[in-house]
């Protein structure tokens, strides 16, 4: 027997039994962004490698260790996209969507990072994100946070996540802080781990994000970024906090929050949870006012967020919030005998005219017991049975598969309306 080919490590199938939960989540995401007036954008899975080097930063874990990069037959370096923001900016610049315009966009699709696979973290993962261009005010920072909060409410997990906020200031303020931080780190270099020593000059703000408890203890005495912010950056952050308080969104200021991508400035945020074991991030984002210009466009204010859907699905399953997810079939239609098959097919087609009703027809014949077994296995709530007697009388037998109710006889011409009320 030939050896079976398996899925690539860290790249998982979503099976038919899992798809309804994914479909529910995706529907909630689409409905929520539509309520805010956002438009969908779809970009290629493969982009020029330079796009991510210039946007994410060459001395980030993603670019250094995690990107799937290859040379095509022309020798061009291409990369499977590791995140969605850079591609959205590239598309906006290329098609003239951004300069002197306001755009509110969203995307959803697969991303790729060569990470160590673990619970809630995969090498191919599905990401949902929103990106807003052309609005400098903190009002829009608040809007995307209100949108994310609304998502948690609609999914029933708002009590299981918390919002962490920080501000990184503008480029000049960060440069001044960077110098002060490097000076501090140089004084304690021998206490830093190898990773932090490597980042001390190339990307010192990332040292603040170190997961090493000894490094975090040392950073308690480090200079604070907030002390280097000017009046405008402080005002932007204060206005954001004021708006969040006005709409009742609780938050916690985390001065160590810097995010893992180089393009952020001013507002950065993460929604975190401890429902998945160790505290984990389920949504993250911030402002990236310099990225559009960095990628060849005119300087344009921008803000956005992204979330990995696998983690949200895992969270819904962990919290047992999947009971209201409907299966793929509501009604299973059967025919007892060859003469009844055409009638059964017609009945199934009529039922499919009912908006949202999911109907499966039995195919291939078989006795009553076999067909009822298939009906039960389908997960349907109702089975429609058409035998010779029902056919002669213009009726169907309606069997309840998930409730203790007596079988009913229903006229074929009123069946669709009757079933619509039941389902």
From Swiss-Prot:
The keyword ATP-binding applies. Pfam families: HGTP_anticodon (PF03129), tRNA-synt_His (PF13393). It is an enzyme of class 6 (ligase). CDD domains: HisRS-like_core, HisRS_anticodon. SUPFAM superfamilies: Class II aaRS ABD-related, Class II aaRS and biotin synthetases. GO terms for molecular function: ATP binding; histidine-tRNA ligase activity. The keyword Transmembrane helix does not apply. GO terms for biological process: histidyl-tRNA aminoacylation. Gene3D superfamilies: Anticodon-binding domain (3.40.50.800), Bira Bifunctional Protein, Domain 2 (3.30.930.10). Its EC number is 6.1.1.21. It comes from the Bacteria. GO terms for cellular component: cytoplasm. It catalyses: tRNA(His) + L-histidine + ATP = L-histidyl-tRNA(His) + AMP + diphosphate + H(+). Keywords: Aminoacyl-tRNA synthetase, ATP-binding, Cytoplasm, Ligase, Nucleotide-binding, Protein biosynthesis. InterPro entries: aa-tRNA-synth_II, aa-tRNA-synth_II/BPL/LPL, Anticodon-bd, Anticodon-bd_dom_sf, His-tRNA-ligase, HisRS-like_core, HisRS/HisZ, HisRS_anticodon. It is found in: Cytoplasm. Homodimer. Belongs to the class-II aminoacyl-tRNA synthetase family. This is Histidine--tRNA ligase.
